[in-house]
């Protein structure tokens, strides 16, 4: 029979899931961070990743709507503000669009979503469905991938600035903000999970939620790797740098 874990034991199990399954282990990220991708491949990554960025505040709004405690809502709503900002020129979504602009992508194309890989779209929609349909505890637990974000952000920024002459620190401003936002958010979510996962069944659910979220992130990179690295099978309507030259700024 499975024993109830202490809060610290539960945290250790959650961190072990991240150490094994977080997308920093994916080969595509190794290529990205070590300068092994060309400009078109980096563009494809940024364009597809925007779909995930765009849906983060939708995910957080869905979670917020299920919170009955005003104090809890006041804390969680900061996540929405972080990404939506106070204006169209502020926030995480705007900063990601600044990155795609800097990479030479047409903003209308990026925002339209019409050049996405199907795998990207399906993975992001699966995540939105999860937080809407599962328990509040599971939805919050699914955000715990942010525990592992600062490490990959540091690798990404350092690697991209070192290896890609078409990337600047200004273009990567999104990640600078996440270095403070992600630890704040994950500390709160981890405390919530450790406090409320107070049965064996609930502890199994929160571990499964983190496992699922890791698979969402991994699936997006699988789609990118198959399409833009090897074997190079691109959905006919997805972004192709050479073919879409007319849709990408010089």
Curated annotation (Swiss-Prot):
GO terms for MF: pyrroloquinoline-quinone synthase activity
One Pfam entry name: TENA_THI-4
Annotated EC: 1.3.3.11
Domain of life: Bacteria
Electron transport listed as a keyword: no
Keyword Oxidoreductase in annotation: yes
InterPro entries listed in its UniProt record: Haem_Oase-like_multi-hlx, PqqC, PqqC-like, Thiaminase-2/PQQC
Catalytic reaction equation(s): 6-(2-amino-2-carboxyethyl)-7,8-dioxo-1,2,3,4,7,8-hexahydroquinoline-2,4-dicarboxylate + 3 O2 = pyrroloquinoline quinone + 2 H2O2 + 2 H2O + H(+)
UniProt KW keywords: Oxidoreductase, PQQ biosynthesis
Annotated metabolic or biological route of this protein: Cofactor biosynthesis; pyrroloquinoline quinone biosynthesis
Enzyme class: oxidoreductase
Biological processes per GO annotation: pyrroloquinoline quinone biosynthetic process; sulfur compound metabolic process
Similarity field: Belongs to the PqqC family.
UniProt xrefs under PANTHER family: 4-AMINOBENZOATE SYNTHASE (PTHR40279:SF3), PQQC-LIKE PROTEIN (PTHR40279)
UniProt function note: Ring cyclization and eight-electron oxidation of 3a-(2-amino-2-carboxyethyl)-4,5-dioxo-4,5,6,7,8,9-hexahydroquinoline-7,9-dicarboxylic-acid to PQQ.
Name of the protein described by the UniProt record: Pyrroloquinoline-quinone synthase
Gene from which this protein is expressed: pqqC
């Amino acid at each position: 029979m499975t024993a109830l874990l202490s809060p610290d034991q539960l945290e250790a199990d959650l961190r072990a899931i991240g150490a094994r399954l977080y997308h920093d282990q994916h080969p595509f990220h190794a290529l990205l961070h070590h300068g092994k991708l060309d400009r078109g491949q980096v563009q494809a990554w940024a364009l597809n990743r925007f779909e995930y960025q765009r849906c983060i505040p939708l995910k957080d709004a869905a979670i917020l709507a299920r919170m009955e405690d005003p104090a809890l809502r006041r804390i969680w709503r900061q996540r929405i503000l972080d990404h939506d900002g106070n204006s169209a020129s502020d926030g995480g979504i705007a900063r990601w669009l600044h990155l795609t602009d800097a990479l030479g992508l047409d903003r209308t194309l990026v925002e339209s979503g019409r050049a996405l890989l199907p795998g990207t779209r399906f993975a992001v929609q699966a995540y939105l469905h999860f937080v809407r349909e599962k328990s509040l505890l599971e939805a919050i637990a699914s955000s715990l991938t942010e525990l592992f974000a600062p490490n990959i952000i540091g690798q990404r920024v350092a690697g991209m600035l070192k290896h890609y002459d078409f990337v600047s620190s200004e273009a990567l401003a999104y990640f600078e903000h996440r270095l403070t936002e992600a630890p704040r958010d994950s500390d709160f979510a981890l405390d919530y999970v450790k406090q409320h996962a107070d049965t064996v069944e609930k502890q199994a659910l929160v571990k499964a939620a983190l496992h699922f979220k890791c698979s969402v992130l991994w699936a997006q990179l699988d789609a990118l790797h198959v399409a833009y690295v090897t074997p190079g099978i691109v959905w006919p309507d997805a972004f192709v740098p050479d073919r879409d030259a007319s849709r990408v700024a010089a």
